[in-house]
Every structure is written in structure tokens, then in C-alpha cells.
């Protein structure tokens, strides 16, 4: 399955929640009515969605939010099952450790897609070494930075300014002057308020 390249607001409307696929400066919440599905006037059918349908929709939502395709998402789930603790929380923790997501959380990219592009264009280092793999898993204590030649890019400067206004997550510590940050720890499930019901995903893969 290829990565979706169509309108971002359409995906958020389909899932009924903001997937944070666009910059906070142009919030999808202001551009899309989440109580209607894609279509000229939205679909008004009140048909009840099956349990399987709800589980599948939740998985699709999380995949789109983090920009992960099915095969890779399944591998994350299998890895989460092998870890101690709650499988659903482990799954989200692994997704939060992805380098593209950490770059986004630190405010170097205004969206995860933009952060992924920075990684693939070799604009990001981890502990002083260039890393261009978006799925690279960042560990607690790792220092993630923008390379010197990229620090003055307008999109990075603007994204960081916006992130400072909105506020950084507690599990990252960012030095805006150096355009670098430390990934302090894998966030606890209750530390990020994403509109995700990960138990539905666990139920889906346990069928």
C-alpha cells in the first residue's frame, strides 16, 4: 500500500478527529467538520459500525497519524507484544520513539510529514551522527539536532517558534538556540493526550 498523498483534511474528517497532519498554524479543526465524512455534504447515514469496523478504523487512524504503513505497523505491534507491560501502551511508546516523530515533538518540523522530510534529507543528527532513517528508534538520553547548514531554513525556524508558543512535551528538552534537544524518556501513556483507543488495535490483532 502506497503512502497517501491526497488532501490531509480529508483524512482527518474521515477519522472524525484532528490527526495533526497539518501545521498548528493552519489547524484542520478550523477547516474541516469532523462530524461529517468526506463528500460534498458529508454522509448522514446513522448505520452502526461493527466492532471489527471500529477496530479497523482505530488502526487506520493511528497509522495515518504517525505516517506508518501496514507491514511496518504490524512489526511495531509484534515488538510491543514482546515487551513487558500493556501492549497498547507499548505500541504507542514505540511510535513515539520514531526519529521523525521525535523531530516533530521537538518542534523542528511543523508536522510529522515535514519532520520525516528533514530526516530523509539528512538535516538531522542523533548524538552527532547523521541519521536519515525516519523509523530509527530514539533512546532515552539521545540528543537530536538539526545540522548546522540547515538551522537557518525558514520552515525550521518558523516551526520551532510555533512549538515554543504551543509548548513542548515533558519528555523532550529543547535548546532552541542550538536547535537541538534531548529525548528524556519514552512518554507514559497518560502524558500525551492523543485521541487514541489503543485497546481496539490490540483487539483487532488478537482476532
From Swiss-Prot:
Organism placement in taxonomy: Bacteria, Pseudomonadati, Pseudomonadota, Betaproteobacteria, Burkholderiales
HAMAP family, sorted: Ribosomal_uS4_B
InterPro entries registered for this protein in UniProt: Ribosomal_uS4 (IPR022801), Ribosomal_uS4_bac-type (IPR005709), Ribosomal_uS4_CS (IPR018079), Ribosomal_uS4_N (IPR001912), S4_RNA-bd (IPR002942), S4_RNA-bd_sf (IPR036986)
Subunit structure: Part of the 30S ribosomal subunit. Contacts protein S5. The interaction surface between S4 and S5 is involved in control of translational fidelity.
Assigned keywords, A-Z: Ribonucleoprotein, Ribosomal protein, RNA-binding, rRNA-binding
Function in brief: One of the primary rRNA binding proteins, it binds directly to 16S rRNA where it nucleates assembly of the body of the 30S subunit.
Keyword RNA-binding included in the entry's annotation: yes
SUPFAM superfamilies xrefs: Alpha-L RNA-binding motif
Domain of life: Bacteria
A GO term for molecular function: rRNA binding
Protein's recorded name: Small ribosomal subunit protein uS4
Region (Disordered): 31-52
Similarity field: Belongs to the universal ribosomal protein uS4 family.
Domain S4 RNA-binding: 97-157
GO terms of biological process kind: ribosomal small subunit biogenesis; translation
Pfam families, alphabetized: Ribosomal_S4, S4
Residue spans crossing the bilayer: none
GO (cellular component) term, any one: small ribosomal subunit
Amino acid at each position: 500500500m502506497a503512502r497517501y498523498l491526497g488532501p490531509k483534511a480529508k483524512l482527518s474528517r474521515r477519522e472524525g478527529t484532528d490527526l495533526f497532519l497539518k501545521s498548528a498554524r493552519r489547524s484542520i479543526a478550523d477547516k474541516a467538520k469532523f462530524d461529517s465524512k468526506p463528500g460534498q455534504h458529508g454522509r448522514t447515514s446513522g448505520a452502526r459500525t461493527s466492532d471489527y469496523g471500529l477496530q479497523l478504523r482505530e488502526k487506520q487512524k493511528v497509522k495515518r497519524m504517525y505516517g506508518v504503513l501496514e507491514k511496518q505497523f504490524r512489526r511495531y505491534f509484534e515488538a510491543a507484544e514482546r515487551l513487558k507491560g500493556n501492549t497498547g501502551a507499548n505500541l504507542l511508546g514505540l511510535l513515539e520513539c520514531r526519529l521523525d516523530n521525535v523531530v516533530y515533538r521537538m518542534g523542528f518540523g511543523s508536522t510529522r510529514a515535514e519532520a520525516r522530510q528533514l530526516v530523509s534529507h539528512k538535516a538531522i543528527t542523533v548524538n552527532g551522527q547523521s541519521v536519515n532513517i525516519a523509523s530509527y528508534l530514539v533512546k532515552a538520553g539521545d540528543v537530536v539536532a538539526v545540522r548546522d547548514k540547515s538551522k537557518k531554513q525558514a520552515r525550521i525556524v518558523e516551526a520551532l517558534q510555533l512549538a515554543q508558543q504551543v509548548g513542548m512535551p515533558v519528555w523532550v528538552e529543547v535548546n532552541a538556540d542550538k536547535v537541538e534537544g534531548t529525548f528524556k524518556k519514552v512518554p507514559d501513556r497518560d502524558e500525551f493526550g492523543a485521541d487514541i483507543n489503543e485497546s481496539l488495535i490490540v483487539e483487532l490483532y488478537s482476532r
